[in-house]
Amino acid sequence: MESIHCNSLLNPNFSLNQRRRRINHAVLNRRDALLRSLNAVELRRSRTFSAVRTSNFSVTAAATDVGGRNSTDASVMTTAMSGVERGVRVGKSSSALEQLDIERGVCVPFRKYSPETVRSKVLESRGAVVSLVSRGVEIVWTLGLYWSTLTYDFLVGRDEEVVPFRARQLRNLLCNLGPSFIKAGQVLANRPDIIREDYMNELCILQDDVPPFPNEVAFNIIEEELGQPLENIFSKISSQTIAAASLGQVYRATLRATGEDVAIKVQRPQIEPIIYRDLFLFRTLASFLNGFSLQKLGCNAELIVDEFGEKLLEELDYTLEARNIEDFLENFKDDPTVKIPGVYKNLCGPRVLVMEWIDGIRCTDPQAIKDAGIDLNGFLTVGVSAALRQLLEFGLFHGDPHPGNIFAMQDGRIAYVDFGNVAVLSQQNKQILIDAVVHAVNEDYGEMANDFTRLGFLAKDTDVSPIVPALEAIWQNSAGKGLADFNFRSVTGQFNKLVYDFPIRIPERFSLVIRSLLTQEGICFTLKPDFKFLEVAYPYVAKRLLTDPNPALRERLIQVLFKDGVFQWKRLENLLSLAKENVAKMSSNPNLRVKRVESKLDLTDTIKDGARLFLLDEGIRRKLILALTEDSKLHVEELVDVYRLVEDEVDIPTLAMQVVQDLPNVFRDFVLSWSNSVLSDR
């Protein structure tokens, strides 16, 4: 029976509608599966497949159906499908999975993966022993030969000079071993805690493009999943795939009922038994190597396989990606700068996904973007802001934003496709990330090291004192270059070196985040080589700190403004200037003239909360009074400078009226605070 963690209902990352979807997911999946099975049986009885398709169904060539799309006009959808941390829990979780849940810090309402589930599925299948032995021999023989060549290179002293060749050899080897190993290679490309950097660089270009499987097979799968003939649903469908990958392939089609163009993802046939078999072998090998990996590499091999297995199995259920799309639609429903394609839930199943077709311009073609009349700087600003909102505001992050998945719309919006591979961050992890930013600003590297422990990069009992100087060196070296030379790739490269010197393990969710940020930064540099990522990122973060009513962010704002108990007037001025810059860039973006974008920095709630804190929090009140009178003088000049920054952003009469209206509540809270203080003194 499918199980639900009740705590998932309280997850603050998700809206009420999103929580409802998670509650009903298991029941609806069971119902839909039964309906699909019944419809498929009926379909097999009555279908005259080839005759109907020949007479009534229009299969068009991809070149004409796509409308002569060139290399710059885009909507190619890859099929890297990784759901968020969900699945059906079957059986008792292993200790590694329990550790995975603890480290993740998010609720897991559904789970398909557990070592016990994989073992039972594999061993209960027909011919399991023969299949496992033959596959095991193939894997051991292939990897053994490769390992022997590495050993020989080391013995003859040429191991360093042949690294480029061996790295390419490893990439080709993984491709030949099939989809599980292709996905494993993509994971390794983001794990400096497991392999060295030169091999990572080679695996970064690992593509899961593979020959497509026959159309007849794909169309049969679509009909089985949807429970009716194709010609009843689509008036035409491309005769060639738009994209083909290790787990599935994509077609373009037109809905018969509405005439809308859609993209159809179809999963490869009989891929699930292959994935389960390989995961069983991976987990078996990991159990043998776990002691070695813990001692020599400082990482838990079983935990790494469990993270990988959970994500990979979720890729096999396209209903999870449909739910991801709904979540992104919910998150960006009021954002006029972002386009998320709609999903046709009634036309989706575990092996088929139907979503809105996106017509856009490939995001790595600056000339095509300019020719379309799209302001390049405006598009980059929109893209960076959208990425930061996903990471710091929603906690639901697109994990694979490569050029085939991001497009520029004619109206200046940024469009995303392919939502299978997403990273989910809990509310706690989002707050820790903001803490890390605050600690970096305050140059508190000891607390920054503790943040890495809280995020799961370091074991809880790790002594962080040796790591603090290394973090300080990295940050000061990067920050000292200024915005002109600061970029994530250089910082990540320096951080990767720490992995080899300290027991640092990169959690899977953060490897996705890091890869995503690096990919998007690379897209920005492709469009504009002198683009300064932080010149857009800093204003967004400043605006978020100043305007977000979240109590946790209010606390972080106070930490930023006070250093060693001293109020930082310059930081407040910088934050205000940066936040105003963010609003100005968005409101003046020529791509968004017809969109509703805020034109002023709304500080009303911030000022009201500040007044409330001043009255109710004795510590804050004392600090602010000291800030105004420190060094035996009134800081009138600083106050005037701050006022000049906000005078155009704040409607003083309206704010005064709101403060007056709020006075009864503030006075009540003040009396309660005062009475509690008096009673506690007694």
Curated annotation (Swiss-Prot):
Compartment(s) of residence: Plastid, Chloroplast, Plastoglobule; Plastid, Chloroplast
EC number(s) reported in the record: 2.7.-.-, 2.7.11.1
Keyword Nucleotide-binding in annotation: yes
Active-site residues, record numbering mapped to chain: D400 (proton acceptor)
Coiled coil: none
Phenotype upon gene inactivation: High chlorophyll fluorescence and reduced non-photochemical quenching (NPQ) caused by defects in photosynthetic electron transport. Specifically deficient in the electron carrier plastoquinone, as well as in beta-carotene and the xanthophyll lutein, and defective in membrane antioxidant tocopherol metabolism. Altered plastoglobule protein composition.
Tissue expression from the record: Expressed in all tissues (e.g. especially in leaves) at all developmental stages from seed germination to flowering, except in the root tips.
Ranges for domain Protein kinase: 236-567
Gene Ontology annotations for the cellular component aspect, listed alphabetically: chloroplast; plasma membrane; plastoglobule
Catalytic reaction(s) noted: L-seryl-[protein] + ATP = O-phospho-L-seryl-[protein] + ADP + H(+); L-threonyl-[protein] + ATP = O-phospho-L-threonyl-[protein] + ADP + H(+)
A GO molecular-function descriptor: protein serine/threonine kinase activity
Any Gene Ontology biological process: regulation of tocopherol cyclase activity
Induction: Up-regulated by methyl viologen (paraquat, MV) treatment, a herbicide triggering photooxidative stress.
Organelle transit peptide: 1-79
Record-listed ATP binding positions: I242, A243, A244, A245, S246, L247, G248, Q249, V250, K265
Keyword terms: ATP-binding, Chloroplast, Kinase, Nucleotide-binding, Plastid, Stress response, Transferase, Transit peptide
PROSITE patterns: PROTEIN_KINASE_DOM
Function: Kinase that can phosphorylate the tocopherol cyclase VTE1, a key enzyme of tocopherol (vitamin E) metabolism and involved in the recycling of oxidated alpha-tocopherol quinone, possibly stabilizing it at plastoglobules. Also regulates plastoglobule protein composition. Prevents photodamage of chloroplasts under continuous red light, thus working in opposition to ABC1K3. Together with ABC1K1, contributes to plastoglobule (PG) function in prenyl-lipid metabolism, stress response, and thylakoid remodeling.
Family to which the UniProt record says this protein belongs: Belongs to the protein kinase superfamily. ADCK protein kinase family.
PANTHER family reported in the protein's UniProt record: CHAPERONE-ACTIVITY OF BC1 COMPLEX CABC1 -RELATED, PROTEIN ACTIVITY OF BC1 COMPLEX KINASE 1, CHLOROPLASTIC
Subunit structure as annotated in this protein's UniProt entry: Interacts with ABC1K3 in plastoglobules (PG).
Designated name of the protein: Protein ACTIVITY OF BC1 COMPLEX KINASE 1, chloroplastic
Species of the source: Arabidopsis thaliana (Mouse-ear cress)
Gene: ABC1K1
